[in-house]
Amino acid sequence: MQRGFNEVLSSLLFPCILLITLFFLSDSALSKDQGGQKKSIAENNTNTQNQTSPNSQQEPVKLKTITIEATEISAEPIQKLESRELRVHTGETLGKTLEREMGVSNLSYGPGVGQPVIRGMSGPRVRIMQNGIGAHDLSALSPDLAVAFETMLADSITVLRGPATLRYGGNAIGGMVDIKHQRIPEKIPLNGAAGRMDFRYDHNSSDKSGMIGLDIGRGNFAIHIDYFQRSSNNTRIPGAALDEAAIRQQFQVDPETNSSKVIQNSNANSQGGSAGLSMIGKHGHLGGSYHEMTRNYGIPPGVPGHTDGTRTSQEAIRIDMSQRRYDLDGLLKTYWPSLPKIKAKLSYIDYDHRDYDKGITDRSSSLTQFKNSVWESRLEMNHQRGSWLDGVFGMQWQNRNFSATGIETFTPSTNTDSLGFFLTETLFITDRLNLEVGARIEHQTTNPKSNEVRMAGISAPLPLPNTLNYLTYSLAASLNYEILPQTSLYLNWQHAQRAPDVQELFASGPHFATRSFELGRLNLNAEQTNHYELGLRFAGKHASFLANGYYKSIQDFIYLENQGFFFNFAPDPPRFQQTCANLRNCLPVFGYQANHANFWGYEAEITAHPRLSSPFSPRLTLFSDYVRGWFQNGALGDVPRLPPLRFGGEVGFQWMQWRGGLR
């Protein structure tokens, strides 16, 4: 396996080395080409100066800012937050930042988590990326784990659904979120330096946060540095923290503890920073960066999950995470019209977090550590054929080492390799009609690092396979027609496949942060999704409109199902049983299942923003979105954990540089 790993790594490093070589050769050739012109340019400058009065000076002229607005003809459901809109909506988590976007919800397992949910999909079906490379935290593993990124550092956040997601792998089957930042500078700052500061305060939880970023450039080099810090107290609420009636319904007993007016253990703090260096030329850039962050947050107490005689009555699970990230990024603009641009990325991410219970006196003995070390690289080559064809061919490779050690080792250590190739093409049939098509093939190999796993409550070890292989493919097509100026109608179709993640295959133990005992399935097949979508968009000078409807059918949809019994820690040895006599000793058992599921939903938004002659500009928005999922087997009912129907309105205004709103 190590030999195969080295071979794949070498083959993928070659494109990066090639890109670096071409970068230097291109700039070198450009310098030689410009060298012969320097003399004539200097002579022209001298002649110009001779025609100018010796006492005259060149004064800088300040030009009036001109804003150009245009609507791109595309069939992709894409949303982008940037500049002022991003600053206004930035929240303490990624899910909180994006929850106002159509079709996006916030999966909050407490204020410190906040994962994005796209059209009801989350976890391993939504790929979170930073500058086109996976975030590679463990947020896809469990809903109690936060995305390892501070939203204040983002320059833009893009949410993408539909056919274009096939460029990013099976884990983007439900959608993709790409966080852009200038950690690796792509241009020299104007006047040699630029910076940004952002300080925020939230009254409810006394959330105090701030960041500072600085870009400095000279000649062909630019550097970037930034730092952030965030701290919050427990969240205040108007009533009780726990729904005692719901606990009685599931466990048939009364809860032991509850809190009023505040959610206990919901405080959090985080800090981190990054530095990047880039060499920038007329034909692209080449740079690298380092980023590090730490985050400590609590999971609000619910039903107590376990006892060992040393814990207190008030459960307080906390998560202490850290991540170190190394990125290389290169862009080459070539001389060839048919191959105008080549991009290459290589990243290494080292992530770990520890779950611990503040109620245990000996904290060190209760620590459970999760580690996720990932190499990922991408190579993309843009190609064109005149004005009628534009496309991208690329490859993506990833190697992941995952491990969990401690009393909460509910998933064994594994190594996962994946290699994918993709091709997307846009055919401009007429000025008003275009067709986008794409295809991807990907091979994933998952290797447990042990041939067996021992599970609490079962005396005999469970055997594990040496290797699990999945070959998946995706196909997509999108048609976009501009029926009227600024108005387009689009139709999307996609067939996508996703290989099961490690926790879906190998889970076999307690997970105290989610108050559950999880069981995986080794015989899971790859998910297969067929997605259909019809939408209408209008973007005018004083108003905009978006409406779409979609339907998707997913074969072998993987989900966690309550098994109807409990895992009891009190007996020696622990055992599975049908009822729970003491909440402190029990965990409900959830098992991964696969069944055929169907989804349908819609998104609609209309905005009026008349531009008046005065500095005052009003804005009115009406919106609604909805998703429903159900299993084809009627006895199973609806798909669990879907966001509810949402509708509402927003009234806003802008006066000069001030803006406000009510939603």
Residue ranges and their predicted role:
Residues 153-156, 161, 166-247, 267-271, ...:
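Outer-membrane beta-barrel translocator/receptor signature
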Residues 95-137, 155:
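Extracytoplasmic beta-strand/coil segments of soluble accessory domains associated
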